[in-house]
Every structure is written in C-alpha cells, then in structure tokens.
C-alpha cells in the first residue's frame, strides 16, 4: 500500500494509539518497579524501531503487561543496570531466533484460540477499566492478569472501587464513551470533520475541559492529580540525560542475568507471535506478517531499548486493535505514534498531566467492546462445538488467569478436538451383514491405537473383516501390533481377518 496515499488514515490512528499507549507505558513501568520514563522509552522504541524494521502493517509494539512479574523480580534481584544487560541479551537471542526461523511456531496457533484471545482481551479491558472510570486508580494501567500485585483480583477490585467513587471521573468517563460511540455513527461519519478528527482526541480534550470546569464551578467534582496521567517532566534545562539509565556490562556473564535474558526472550517472543497472528486476523485487508522478520525486528528493538534504559517490549494486542479500529492502513501509523510520544513528552508534558485517566478509560471501554462483541460469540457458536469450545475455554482461561496460561489452556482444548476429529476420520468401518470393511483413509499414528481397539471389540463372532490400508502411506508400529493382537484373539471368536496393503 502507498504510505503517502493512506497517511491521512494513519495519522488519525496514530493519535488514538498514542492516547492509549501513554498511560499503558507509564502503568507497566510502575508495576515493573522501573523508572516511569523507562516505559516511555519502550513505547517510543516500540513505535519507531519496530515500525521501521517490521513488515507487520498494523501491529504496534510497546512494554508488555505479561512481562511485569518477570521484570519486577529481575530488577529486585539484579538491580536495574544489570537487568538492562539481560534485556539487551534477550534482544540478541530474538534476532538469532529469527534467523533460525523460529517464527514458524506462530503458525501453529489455532484460529479459535486466537479469536478467543482477542475476545478475552476485550473483556479484560472493560473489567480493568471500570475502576479507573469511577476514579479508583490503585491497580496499574495495562494490567491483564486476574490476580493483581496489590493482593486483589479483577473481580474484587470492582467491589473495592465502588467504595471510592469519584463523581467527576464518572462524568468524564461517560462523556468519553458517548463521544466515541456517537462519533462512529453513520449519521456523523457522513461529514468530513467527523471522519478527519479522531474521536479519542475529542474525548480526551473534552475530559480536560470538563475537569477545568469542575475546578472553577463544581469543586466537589474536581478530579485530583492522583487520577490524572503522571508524566515525568524536566526539572531543569539540560537534565534530560537523568531520565536515561545505562546497562552495567560487567554483569554480562552473570548466570542470573543470562537466565533472565533467556526467560524474557522466550516469553516476549511467544507473546509477540500470538499478538501478530491475532492482529493479522482482524486486519481488514487480510495481510500476513512474516514472523521471522518480526522476531528480528523485536530483537533489535529490545537491544536498543535495553541499551538506553527501557523495558523489554512485545507486539501488544490492545495497541494493535486500537490502531486497526481507528482505520490505520499502513505501518506509518505505528511509526507516527512513536514520534508523537517522543515529541509530546519533550514539548508538552504539563499538558499531558491534565488528562484524566477516566477519559482514557472510556476510550478503552469502546476498544474492548469491539473486541468482544456478542456477534463474535454467535459466529463461533455457529461454527460448531469443535470451534466454540476451544474459543470459550480460551476466553475464560485468559480472563481468570493471564494471557499465556489462558492461551495454553485454549490450545489444549483445541488439540483435543483436533485429535478427536483425526480419530474419527482416519478410519471408516462399513458392514454388510457379517462382512466388515475397515478402511484406513489417512496416515495412522499411535494416537489411533485406542480407536482400533474399540472397533475390534465391536466385531461380532462368526464374521469376516477386511482391513484395507491402500490409502494410508504410514501405519504406526503400535497400530500394527494392535492389528496383530486382534488377528490372534479373533480366532477364538471365529472371525476371519483379511489384510489389504498392510504388512504385519
């Protein structure tokens, strides 16, 4: 696609992604025990570096909520400077993995699981943003795990939030949702103004203006500083270097550093592959991202991020889905969002500090709903149980655990149905009177052993069975042994067994 031709769409999307990414970068840095500016660095590198090197048209990268536990433990154990060495090494490992074509792993994620992951992220966005929408900002922005670092969980946090309602925050979040919803309506999208200006920007500006009105006219509704975006600012000219932390390379051979590096590389790569596959699923142009190239791009970005004091990064579904839903066409939106993030924290940090978190919660509400619309569940149900059950298992598992564990559980359920289908379709048994024909229709592995035993048990006495392997190129040794055993036991039941294209 021509980047120049579609830049008007990409710029609008970049603004939306920037507004979504800003609090997530800060929240994940806070939860990881890292300097707040480390989250900003990671978001900038994820946008610009990955955007330039990756072939993904719509994926957006940044600090990952799924790594916060690993990062927090590593920083506590190693110290931040040594941890940065681990991030650099993790990047190197990812680059090597890309050259070794490890990206092929991403092709093995079932579609039902990927769709379940997207729907689960939508539910999590809605549930996790409710406390922020009502003015209870204890849990960090971007948390996706059911069990939180503050001892609460997603559901108990909702109960807790109702005891700390902030009227002004509620008004702003409702205003944000209304703006986002009406702006997307067909009646308004007919006009160029509404197609050009991002609704998320209006929601945020409106939230800032509402809080300004509260300050001057409705003091009981004022949203205080702790419920606003907290962006680090320069206290004195020339102090920008104070925001950067540099790695301690004397720790490069530290065994603990190496273990953390491999752990980060493995988890970050897996999350990236999952998120890339999921993003490709909702790309309206159905483009396919080269996964090995993506691993290399992520590796280079992690290397750079670690070198200048940033956190490990991955492709992130929340940012990517916001990008796609806002109408992005090319990766220019990803790069532009990184540039906006860079320029805004340098030039207008004081203005960013006026943004209510509840305004951003409204934006994420709408993003979450689009990911988990009822129509998605209806569609998966129509596709049959073999698609719906892995889908719904993935949704529930992710919502009540975390992303990676939930996906793993979903894959197990999907594999069960794959094996069940394979058992059913690999052999066909037909009969006419006491004459049976057992035809092997595809390659038969040891997994089919139980199927053969069950079929053989059902063959009645004084009958005849022909086992035809002419359509099967491979028959596992265990299956051959099962057939051989049946030939021995069938003599007692006066069953005649004939083999066709099968050697025992």
Placement of each model-derived feature along the sequence:
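Core transmembrane helix bundle of multi-pass membrane transport proteins
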Residues: 1-12, 76-102, 106-286, 350-351, ...
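Membrane-embedded helical hairpins/re-entrant loop segments and their flanking transmembrane helices
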Residues: 3-15, 20, 24-57, 250-332
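Hydrophobic alpha-helical segments embedded in the membrane of multi-pass proteins
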Residues: 19-23, 38-48, 64-66, 92, ...
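Alpha-helical transmembrane segments of multipass membrane proteins
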Residues: 25-27, 47-52, 70, 74, ...
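Short, non-helical or kinked segments that cap or interrupt transmembrane helices
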Residues: 32-41, 55-68, 106-114, 194-201, ...
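Helix-loop-helix junctions within the multi-pass membrane cores of secondary transporters/permeases
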Residues: 62, 84-109, 118, 288-359, ...
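The feature marks cytosolic C-terminal regulatory regions of anion transporters and related permeases
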Residues: 370-504
